[in-house]
Amino acid sequence: MRKFSKSHKLDHVCYDIRGPVLEKASEMESAGTKILKLNIGNPAPFNFSAPDEIIHDMIYTLRDAEGYSDSKGIFSARKSIMQYSQLKNLPNVGINDIYTGNGVSELITMSMQGLLDNGDEILVPAPDYPLWTAAVTLAGGNAVHYICDEQNEWNPDIDDIKKKITDRTKGIVIINPNNPTGALYSEEILKEIVEVARSHQLIIFSDEIYDRLVMDSLSRSGYSVHYL
């Protein structure tokens, strides 16, 4: 009988917080240890529910939601994103620059599939949110990890980034505020990364999904590469 094996593209696809780490936590939980499962963004078990007005709006518009929307996403949603960008003073964000999807994970995967040929490289922070490495690998590319130094408050090592750029490098991923380290990069650090990207003509993928979850004092506000 013919045996089917998984694709070698999965060799470097790991998601330990939903795999080995979760299995160990479940084992400890079974033995009586109380476990707080903060490994995934699952708000419902912690009683964070969607606001009632959003639930009501979803019910009200359900009939109108049948069928396909514009390939870039629902116009009203894209307009709201544009207005939000304007409130944050982000320059040059027009309605036609905005694409929406079923969560950022889908859009990351689509971006890598559309950009990378076999052997192309994307610079990814280490440690990283594992989706980035997985998406690059599944698209046939190579995730080249640059160091985020624990001894330097988990900031990116700019010299390490420069050393790892090759003729096959197409882009660099910035996760700020960072997942999983929680580091918030300074304007100076971001400017250095932007200058490296400019000089080598690299695309910057700026993952800022946690930009409103900064718990430090207001004096330590987050910076976005979009301002630079």
Each PLM stretch: what is its role?
Residues 138-144:
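A short helix-loop-beta submotif of the ANL/AMP-binding
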Residues 144, 149-220:
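Active-site phosphate-binding strand-loop segment of PLP-dependent enzymes
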